């Protein structure tokens, strides 16, 4: 996993909803979400599973991708993620 790279990511919450965000350390961010210290939205929908990630050269383009994704409806979001390379978890993230 690339560290300190700007990335746009999507997690699937326990209720099936998606949460999109930006980070420069993806593993740490997922652990933060699952520890209940992440975004307010995800705290009520634990655990979360990483579904998609895009690495970008700078913060600006990663945040533009996040903004674009958040404007889409659910069907469009699923199509967006299918067109890219989905993240295949090599590590289980737990709430412990």
From Swiss-Prot:
SUPFAM superfamilies assigned: GIY-YIG endonuclease (SSF82771)
PROSITE patterns with a match to the protein in the record: GIY_YIG (PS50164)
One Pfam family this sequence matches: GIY-YIG
InterPro entries: GIY-YIG_endonuc, GIY-YIG_endonuc_sf, UPF0213_domain
Domain GIY-YIG: start-end pairs: 4-79
Family: Belongs to the UPF0213 family.
Name by which UniProt lists this protein: UPF0213 protein BCE_0033
